Amino acid sequence: MYDVADSAFTTVIVTALYALYFGTVVVGDPNQADYLWGWGASISEIIVAVVAPILGAIADFSGSRKKFLGVCALTIIFFTAALYFVGPGMVTLGLTLYIIANVGFAGGGVFIDSFLPGISTEQNAGKLSGIKWAMGYASGLLCLLLCFPLAKYIKANPTPYELSRAQLIPVVVAVYYAVAVIFPLIF
């Protein structure tokens, strides 16, 4: 299920550890970081709101929803992994990579939701959607647990060693996402 992959991104990158890394290490000012993080999320959602209807129509008309979903997945994987290169003071790079990855995430949501009518009936759509959500939630927690040992290295003014460990968090998420997304994209 695509939610198994997606929830790793939202739990670790958007909500918990990378948001903490961005504020503590990259920006260094929690208030400024929260402000920037909120703007980054808003910008990515506005981009998706503008282009999703157009891309959705193209995908429906051409029958290539799965290809568009694959592009969104590759966007998330590549730009999440690229967050590894963001260090102290690299606010613009960190925010730009996050915005692009989040566009991939939000865009993927548009396409994945369009598959539900084709794989369910009116009677079981709610149940199937609930199972999908539960599997995604559990997967997000699993990925968070995998990254949690690295979280202790998220510190203001980290040593080079601490920084190198904390920077592995988005790499773990990108690899986890890549493995989890294989099944829904192939079948």
Model-derived regions, located:
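Hydrophobic core of transmembrane alpha-helices in multi-pass small-molecule transporters
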Residues: 73, 79-111
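Central cavity-lining transmembrane alpha-helices of secondary-active solute carriers
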Residues: 13, 17, 34-58, 78, ...
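Cytoplasmic membrane-interface "Motif A"-like loop-to-helix N-cap segments
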Residues: 59-75
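MFS 12-TM fold signature
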Residues: 73-80, 136, 176-180
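Helix-loop boundary and gating motifs at the non-cytosolic
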Residues: 1-45, 91-95
